[in-house]
Amino acid sequence: TLLKEEITVTGAGRTDSKVNAISYIAHFETTVPDLDAGAFGYKINAILPHGIVVHDILPASPEFHARFDARMREYKYFIHRRKDPFMEDYSCLYTFPLDVEKMNRAAALLMGKHDFSCFEKVGSDNKTSICTVSMARWEAYVPDHVRIMGYPASEEDYLVFTIRADRFLRNM
C-alpha cells in the first residue's frame, strides 16, 4: 500500500450505476505523521482507474465523517432535445415537447421539508424518510462542447434538472 498500513476509505454516500460524482468527499485515517498530501495525491491518481481522480487531500478533525457530516447533496439530471453523440453517456435524449415553466412549477412542490417515503426502496431501514429539499429546478444550458465548437443551439436544446437536499433516500 502507499501508506504502508491498512486503511479504510469511507465515502459520502452511494451512487447508482451510470452516475458520475463531482466533488465527492471521502475520509480515511492514517498514522503517517506529516503526510505530504500533494505527493500522496499524485501517487493515488497514478494507480486509480481512468474514470476516477482525486483533486485534493485535506486534513480533517478525527471526528469528521464524510457521510454523516455532509450538509447537502446535489444531483443533476440532463436532457438533450436533439441528437448529440457527445451527450449519450450523460444525458437522456427526449425529443417530445416540454413545458419548462410547468416542469418548474412541479419541481417547486418538492421544495421544503417533506416525507419522501413514497420514493424510497421498499423495505428500506431508514430511521426517517424526512428530507429537506433546498433547490429543485429546470434550466436551459449550453454544454461546453457546443459552446467551444460554435454549434448553433436553441434555448431549450439542453436542459438540466438540479435538486439539492440535506439527504436523499435510497432509490429516491
Each PLM stretch: what is its role?
Residues L2-M172:
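Structured-RNA-binding interfaces characteristic of tRNA pseudouridine synthases
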